[in-house]
């Protein structure tokens, strides 16, 4: 699973997801892509599940680029813990995704195979997405 090697601070504020994505919303590497249509936190497990599903379907033919990286730690308090005594410990990492963000790119395969591979990856995502073709 993806996670930063080291961070400046162990814990972060939750923040809020307003507006659309102005960065990372164009296809850069491949020919076909999966684009987010809703804002969400996508966990490193979900990113890896989508990548594996695409890789398994496309086999050796295509190349896959993962365009998001989970750089935000999410803290969770232990079960049945009383309020107070500080913030919980970091449990997992998420990537903050806004509408318009490209999640995955794929190239080197036909459009029908790319559509099928990306639809499998899209089913692993917790948000609505769309298939995009470069150009």
Swiss-Prot record:
Family, similarity comment: Belongs to the universal ribosomal protein uL16 family.
HAMAP family noted in UniProt: Ribosomal_uL16
Statement: the UniProt record of this protein carries the keyword Ribonucleoprotein: yes
Primary location recorded for the protein, binned into one broad class: plastid
Subunit structure: Part of the 50S ribosomal subunit.
One GO process term, biological-process aspect: mitochondrial translation
Keyword Nuclease: no
Key words, A-Z: Chloroplast, Plastid, Ribonucleoprotein, Ribosomal protein
A Pfam family that the UniProt record links to this protein: Ribosomal_L16
Taxon lineage: Eukaryota, Viridiplantae, Streptophyta, Embryophyta, Tracheophyta
One MF annotation (Gene Ontology) recorded for this entry: rRNA binding
Natural source organism: Piper cenocladum (Ant piper)
Subcellular location: Plastid, Chloroplast
NCBIfam families: rplP_bact
Protein name per its UniProtKB record: Large ribosomal subunit protein uL16c
Annotated GO CC locations: chloroplast; mitochondrial large ribosomal subunit
């Amino acid at each position: 699973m993806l996670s930063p090697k080291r961070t400046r601070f162990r814990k972060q504020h939750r923040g809020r997801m307003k507006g659309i994505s102005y960065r990372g919303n164009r296809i850069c590497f491949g020919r076909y892509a999966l684009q987010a249509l809703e804002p969400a936190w996508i966990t490193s497990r979900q990113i890896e599940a989508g990548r594996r599903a695409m890789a398994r379907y496309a086999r050796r033919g295509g190349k896959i680029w993962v365009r998001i990286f989970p750089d935000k730690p999410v803290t969770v308090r232990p079960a049945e813990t009383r309020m107070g005594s500080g913030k919980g410990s970091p449990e997992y990492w998420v990537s903050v995704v806004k509408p318009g963000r490209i999640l995955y790119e794929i190239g080197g395969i036909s459009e029908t195979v790319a559509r099928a591979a990306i639809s499998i990856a899209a089913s692993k995502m917790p948000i609505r997405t769309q298939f995009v073709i470069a150009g």
